[in-house]
């Protein structure tokens, strides 16, 4: 049986935690930031968890993570 390929786009966007959960970075933080408040930009910092409904699909894209 051949090796499964990791989706390279998913590998760049998601990281698997030691506990087994998947984390992702926040959207809406790349450009057009002048009209966003300091509070909204601060709340978009850091990583957040992936929704349970999406987790199965992401795990299929990252077979060796």
Curated annotation (Swiss-Prot):
GO biological process terms, semicolon-separated: translation
Gene Ontology MF terms: structural constituent of ribosome
InterPro entries hit by this protein: Ribosomal_bL35 (IPR001706), Ribosomal_bL35-like (IPR021137), Ribosomal_bL35_CS (IPR018265), Ribosomal_bL35_sf (IPR037229)
One GO CC term on file: cytosolic large ribosomal subunit
SUPFAM superfamilies: L35p-like (SSF143034)
Keywords tagged on the record: Ribonucleoprotein, Ribosomal protein
Matches recorded under NCBIfam families: rpmI_bact
Homology family: Belongs to the bacterial ribosomal protein bL35 family.
Designated name of the protein: Large ribosomal subunit protein bL35
Organism per entry: Aromatoleum aromaticum (strain DSM 19018 / LMG 30748 / EbN1) (Azoarcus sp. (strain EbN1))
